[in-house]
């Protein structure tokens, strides 16, 4: 049994190796897990190594190899042709959104997050709205920091396993690594896309061949958070 942080680090290393062929640096791992120092990463890596999930490769820099993944690991469907970080997914009926005005912890170890409106997975729509209701989200899907929920509208991210009507869990922030799926504000419009840093430009990539990649200057794109999880509810 892995702790939440051990699981998060293992999946981050696994996805980064799939994306680039190289394990992430200690600085990247520290930032991804919101840890204050690299010593915490060293402890997590040692624990994963002792449990047989990863191993260090001798005589190579940044040399970590994922040996196995926990059986309960669940990720969204991979983007075809583009290995990348994929969020945790909770599928099922779920709990209905509530209209509670204040954040609170539910009895089943979940946190009620604000649903701030709809986000376009397609052509950008108007910028994020004000809170309309709240959705219980399991604590296991969340780390440190402030989070919010958006309802997906459109089909441009279907090859990343993100479907029309899904609820995406967003960690609030104004920075993201290349390859991460983000909420991007372009002018007065918000969209959910994979961010790529290409020299001095920012590319917003869809995960659907019907949609073109859009290129912007760095001052034209405002990151408002990055995707960390997804809830799919069946009615």
UniProtKB/Swiss-Prot annotation:
Catalytic site positions: 156, 193
Pfam families: LexA_DNA_bind (PF01726), Peptidase_S24 (PF00717)
E.C. number(s) listed in UniProt: 3.4.21.88
GO biological process: DNA repair; DNA replication; negative regulation of DNA-templated transcription; proteolysis; SOS response
Annotated region (Disordered), positions in chain: 72-104
Site (Cleavage): 121-122
Keyword annotations from UniProtKB, A to Z: Autocatalytic cleavage, DNA damage, DNA repair, DNA replication, DNA-binding, Hydrolase, Repressor, SOS response, Transcription, Transcription regulation
HAMAP family associated with the record: LexA
Protein name as it appears in the record: LexA repressor
Organism name: Caulobacter sp. (strain K31)
């Amino acid at each position: 049994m892995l702790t939440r942080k051990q699981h998060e680090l293992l999946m981050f290393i696994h996805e980064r190796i799939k994306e680039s062929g190289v394990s992430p640096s200690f600085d990247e791992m520290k930032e991804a897990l919101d840890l204050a120092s690299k010593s915490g990463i060293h402890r997590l890596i040692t624990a994963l190594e002792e449990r047989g999930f990863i191993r260090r490769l001798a005589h190579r820099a940044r040399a970590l190899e994922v040996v196995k993944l926990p059986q309960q690991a669940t990720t969204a469907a991979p983007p075809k042709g583009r290995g990348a970080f994929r969020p945790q997914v909770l599928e099922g009926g779920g709990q209905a959104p509530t209209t509670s005005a204040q954040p609170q912890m539910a009895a089943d170890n979940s946190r009620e997050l604000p649903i701030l409106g709809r986000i376009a997975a397609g052509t950008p729509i108007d910028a994020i709205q004000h809170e309309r209701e709240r959705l219980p989200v399991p604590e296991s899907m969340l780390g440190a920091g402030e989070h919010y929920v958006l309802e997906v509208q459109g089909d441009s991210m279907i090859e990343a396993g993100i479907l029309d009507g899904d609820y995406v869990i967003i960690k609030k922030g104004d920075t993201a690594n290349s390859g991460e799926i983000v909420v991007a504000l372009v002018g007065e419009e918000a969209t959910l896309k994979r961010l790529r840093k290409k020299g001095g430009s920012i590319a917003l990539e869809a995960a659907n061949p019907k949609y073109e990649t859009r290129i912007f200057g760095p001052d034209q794109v405002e990151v408002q958070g990055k995707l960390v999880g997804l809830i799919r509810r069946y009615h």
